[in-house]
Amino acid sequence: MIFIRIIRNYFFKLGHVVCARTVKNFAKSEQFISKPGPRSIGNILLADKICDGKLFVFGNIFELGDKVIWDHSLSSIENYEELHGFPWLDDLAARGDKAAVEIVQKWVFSWIEKYGSGSGPGWTPRLTSRRLIRLIHHEDTILNGLSEKYISTYFKSIYKHANFISKRFYKTDKLTMNFEAIVGVISVSYTHLRAHETA
């Protein structure tokens, strides 16, 4: 029984990898019809530590220095994969000042550059849905003052996330209810996307 479960989980993960790398990221729209707005609450005290170059994660302090989080070797951190669900985005968005916004933008777009093509440990239905929900909730913070190039990159990533979840949320261990993956799909469906209007 255990062996069968291991084999099944292996093929689930393999399927996630293949899907993440092949799913389309072409976004026909660059705007939400309904303004999503933040619905998750962060911790300003944790954001303060991040702005000071320290990440409080799973009971430990991780020294960031001046580097973007994804430039560090994170495998030594227990459950480091959870960072790919972007829990820190809630905290930084709650603080919301210039320093926090700059970190948000650096971390989000460096993640997209490094892992957005479908690589890394973050492409599971659970983590992808958590990440997608937060990316949608904190759109204003992420895109604050950025150019059309970054806006386009953001919406392409949103499209890829939603496309991945729609194909993979049911391909998971039946013992783990993937409620968040379903919520991720609903979030995109609810907010909708429409073609960006140009003058």
What are these regions (language model features)?
Residues M1-D173, F179-I186:
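Extracellular glycan-targeting catalytic surfaces
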Residues H192-A199:
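Single conserved hydrophobic/aromatic residue that forms the stacking wall/gate
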